[in-house]
């Protein structure tokens, strides 16, 4: 009874101070996403790590370490660049092209790539050199992400005779279906299908390639939580994003994607010394992401800070809550869907207190590239033009009213503001305030970006050395168009087109290579200026045309020095890397506890420094036994302080200007990573044992809590240190084993059985985490105490198992 009374009184404690994740827009943290499709692709490939392609070796250890939160050389996975014939594509398209047999190359570092000017980010490069795929059907029992998958791929030569020629038309196809619940994390499931076809031909002076792909998926995703919630439930896969509805599990966070994609290229030799290439890519994506929301009601998120024992200073209340969590009472540990329905049904006017919204993004991406390669007086020159058009429309849709009749499309935070209480309508263009299921509400806007670039790369040899010099000059135009006219920012302040931002990115890189005998040396330099993401150029893109102050390019200065040794049984690589980023920016949206209102914060003058050494080795111990190893030891830190300018969200008035003491903080990228494996291949048996270690890592730091305005507000040095100190995460380790056996049934027919055990030791690894921007004030013995909100973390999977059966014919 005491617990019920406590929760009933909770709404009157700090109703206005909700976590920004609870009420409205919050950033889609990329590190929280489980890349289920990559796991499915690896299962379909079986023991692809045992292949002969060095690119596949690198990708394998990169993938295994990324499951522990690894980022190669301090560069996050989502920053990687994927290209096909020098046009940018998505990671999803890259993976499907690989499944269609299109050759790929994994390029690390800052060297030039496929004729363009290199960048610091890693590249997966595809070119029209398709492999002939033997027909194969593959079935997998996964358990992680989804339960089952079934795939088929094959290629055919379209010839009228029985003789297969190199210049025949080649048709390749790939189909993958997957479905079912996650067996390791409650509330997760994945359903999806992928279809891809490609058609290509090489003939006398021409090469033509076309590919069409249609991926679709619908899956639930995990939500980061606090370590307190995990420890209370003793469930390292605890997921607060689901609950029971009429006795059945229901997730509040469901991601859906449909992305028809076309890519193509045409190459023609124009003479003895010149080749022309025309390549293009088009993707039209429909993406949705549901979330539970509420109006004039208590938070429905079970791990909200006010629902955890640590929030209460009363021992009896804290004890009862602790018991409820430790016994995993789903009424407290998960979303109470039935209670949400009941709350909506008793609303006097039929409006929704709780509802499910769908944050939709309709994207169109078009890329076109025309380049030429010419050999002139011993210099290989590649030059061309590239155009990219990207248009993203963001809007919210009422997904489920949870038994209510309608939703009021108003800004509840403005309505409760005494100054702006009469300007609460989200869209003056609408004829009614009520929104029904399927209606747009909240916000509706488009961000458009058009870029044109010219580039050139020259490669030549002199004194037994190779040189490369590349230049890339671009112009980028970005603007916003609002389809809703928010009453708070009426007319062109929110509706219609914004002022366009024009930036001029540029890159310059130089590379030197020298080989003698079994040894090779290289050195690479890069200077670049890059445009920020479109959403970072607006103070609040959801409903405001206002630009951030002085939009400008971020800059990068990078250098790498490498050495490699190759012999019959051993290959070694060593790379020293250094990259310095300056003038980076970010925009944050959160509830400011000192100002007691929602704010938009522009963070500028961000500086980062990544430096370290990466060692890689591959050894062939015998005819059947081989090993690979990699160690990366670096320092990935913020440098100096950053400027944080905070504006009130309701009127853009200046709230505060302060410097953030972010210098010295880890960028949330691990500073130590180790991979080692041993592989055995004999006859039709294959086995792989690998060990992964990721250490010296921390949660992503908050710029806000480190501002002078916030940490000097704390009354004691100890509490100031708590706001400034960055949580160090424990080292993450995993031991993985894979085993495969191929049974040859006939000349061209076989069955392959594969078994993979990941994280065999069942270690509980935190894969990512981040600091929240909020602080709380607590009165203890009539004395005020200030402390930061608990960090949000995500634990990786424990011991998992995958079984794959493939039939080739």
Predicted regions and their residues:
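Gram-negative outer-membrane beta-barrel transporters
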Residues: 461-464, 577-580, 585, 597-705, ...
């Amino acid at each position: 009874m005491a617990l019920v009374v406590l929760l009933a009184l909770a709404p009157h404690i700090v109703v206005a101070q909700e976590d920004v994740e609870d009420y409205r827009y919050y950033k889609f943290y990329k590190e929280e996403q489980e890349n289920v499709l990559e796991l499915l692709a690896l299962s379909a490939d079986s023991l692809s790590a045992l292949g002969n392609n060095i690119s596949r070796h690198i990708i394998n250890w990169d993938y295994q370490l990324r499951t522990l939160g690894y980022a190669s050389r301090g560069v996050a996975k989502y920053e990687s660049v994927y290209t096909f014939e020098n046009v940018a594509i998505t990671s999803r398209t890259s993976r499907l092209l690989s499944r269609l047999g299109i050759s790929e190359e994994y390029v690390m570092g800052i060297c030039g790539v496929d004729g363009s000017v290199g960048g610091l980010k890693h590249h997966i490069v595809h070119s029209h050199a398709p492999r002939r795929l033997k027909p194969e059907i593959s079935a997998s029992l996964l358990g992680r992400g989804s339960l089952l998958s079934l795939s088929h791929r094959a290629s055919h030569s379209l010839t009228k005779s029985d003789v297969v020629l190199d210049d025949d038309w080649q048709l390749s196809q790939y189909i993958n279906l997957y479905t079912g619940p996650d067996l390791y994390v409650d509330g997760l499931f994945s359903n999806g299908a992928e279809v891809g076809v490609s058609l290509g031909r090489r003939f006398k002076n021409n090469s033509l390639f076309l590919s069409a792909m249609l991926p679709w998926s619908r899956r639930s995703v995990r939500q980061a939580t606090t370590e307190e919630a995990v420890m209370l439930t003793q469930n390292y896969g605890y997921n607060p994003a689901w609950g029971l509805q009429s006795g059945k599990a229901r997730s509040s966070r469901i991601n859906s994607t449909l992305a028809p994609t076309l890519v193509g290229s045409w190459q023609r030799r124009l003479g003895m010394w010149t080749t022309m290439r025309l390549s293009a890519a088009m993707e039209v994506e429909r993406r949705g992401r549901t979330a539970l929301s509420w109006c004039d009601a208590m938070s429905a998120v079970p791990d909200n800070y006010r629902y955890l024992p640590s929030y209460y200073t009363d021992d009896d209340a804290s004890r009862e809550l602790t018991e409820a969590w430790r016994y995993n009472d789903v009424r407290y540990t998960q979303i109470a869907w039935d209670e949400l329905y009941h709350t909506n049904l008793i609303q006097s006017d039929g409006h929704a207190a709780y509802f499910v919204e769908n944050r939709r993004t309709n994207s169109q991406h078009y890329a076109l590239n025309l380049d030429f390669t010419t050999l002139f007086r011993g210099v290989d020159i590649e030059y061309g033009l590239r155009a990219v058009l990207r248009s993203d429309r963001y809007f919210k849709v009422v997904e489920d009213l949870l038994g209510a009749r309608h939703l009021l499309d108003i800004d509840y935070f403005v309505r409760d503001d005494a100054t702006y209480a009469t300007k609460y309508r989200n869209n003056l263009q609408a004829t009614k305030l009520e929104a029904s299921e399927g209606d747009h509400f909240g916000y509706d806007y488009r961000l458009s970006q058009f870029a044109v670039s010219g580039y050139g790369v020259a490669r030549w040899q002199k004194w037994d050395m190779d040189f490369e010099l590349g230049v890339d000059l671009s112009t980028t135009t970005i603007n916003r168009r609002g389809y809703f006219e928010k009453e708070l920012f009426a007319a062109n302040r929110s509706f219609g087109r914004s002022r366009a931002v024009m930036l001029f990115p540029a890159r310059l890189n130089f590379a030197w290579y020298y080989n003698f005998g079994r040894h090779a040396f290289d050195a690479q330099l890069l200077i670049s200026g890059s445009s920020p993401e479109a959403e970072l150029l607006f103070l609040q893109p959801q409903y405001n045309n206002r630009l951030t102050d002085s939009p400008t390019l971020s800059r990068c200065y990078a250098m790498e020095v490498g050495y490699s040794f190759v012999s019959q049984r051993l290959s070694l690589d060593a790379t020293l890397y250094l990259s310095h980023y300056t003038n980076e920016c970010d925009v944050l949206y959160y509830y400011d506890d000192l100002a007691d209102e929602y704010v938009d914060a522009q963070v500028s003058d961000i500086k980062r420094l990544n430096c370290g050494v990466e060692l890689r080795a591959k050894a062939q111990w015998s005819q059947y036994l081989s090993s690979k190893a990699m160690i990366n030891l670096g320092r990935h830190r913020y440098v100096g302080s950053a400027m944080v300018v905070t504006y009130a969200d309701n009127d853009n008035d200046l709230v505060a200007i302060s410097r953030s003491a972010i210098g010295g903080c880890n960028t949330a990228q691990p500073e130590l990573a180790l991979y080692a494996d041993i592989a055995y291949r004999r006859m039709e048996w294959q086995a792989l044992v690998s060990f992964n270690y990721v250490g010296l890592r921390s949660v992503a730091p908050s710029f806000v809590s480190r501002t002078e305005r916030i940490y000097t507000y704390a009354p004691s040095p100890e509490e100031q240190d708590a706001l400034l100190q960055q949580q160090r995460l424990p080292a993450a380790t995993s031991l993985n084993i894979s085993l495969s056996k191929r049974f040859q049934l006939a000349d061209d027919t076989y069955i392959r059985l594969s078994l993979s055990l990941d994280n065999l030791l069942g270690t509980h690894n935190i894969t990512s985490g981040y600091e929240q921007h909020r602080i709380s004030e607590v009165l203890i013995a009539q004395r005020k105490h200030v402390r930061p909100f608990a960090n949000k973390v995500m634990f990786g999977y424990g011991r998992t198992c995958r079984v794959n059966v493939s039939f080739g014919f």
